[in-house]
Amino acid sequence: MLFKKLWRTMGLYKAQFLSMIIMIALGIGIFVGFNMEWYSIDQNTSSFLKETNFADYRLITDEKFSKDELEKVQKIDGVEKAARYFSVNADVKEQEGDSLAMTITEDESVSGFYLVEGADYDPESENGIWLSDKYAAANNISVGDSLTLIYKDTELSGIVQGLIKSGEHMICVRDESQLMPDFKTYGFAYIAPAMYNKAFHRHSDFYEQINIISSKDQSDLLKDVYTTLEKAVLV
């Protein structure tokens, strides 16, 4: 009896039932689609960050970290890798108004990059620049072009050795005032420690950051860092 009544009701309200079925099917399809897309994005992002050796933790100080302090951090139980790191905005001489996040890591296996085109990274290069591929594309810059970065009145002239992507600069904005990336005017570039040393001489040992790769819990790592370095740092 109830079954017959249900069929009678469905017959009277065919359009409404059909609309309801379509809406349910669409809702399920959209939900499954979003979940699949999110899973794909999550997997691709994780793979990219791992491939570019994205740091798990960053120690930051107002002073500088010495090589001895780096070695102490590297010896902390649970720290897989650690490297001194420096990144600062530098003007681009050839592109008025443009800036690049000039980046140096003492160990490319920590906070390094993925090479899209060009030569492999050379830590001993005194004139090599590895440039953001998106900034290069937006400004018609190719491998082999000359580029001059200016930081604190010091010019660093080099040759674009490669075009790259970097997990450390996945969100590439100039400062807090810039909400969205604008690769026409701002990007990033890696230079080797050798180029940094050549340009700044005795001031080239200024690294205000140590980047760490570790699966250790943050609170435990912070406790060990304070005990080891005995100085104020941010993680």
Region roles according to the model:
Residues 3-235:
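Membrane transport/envelope proteins' first extracytoplasmic loop
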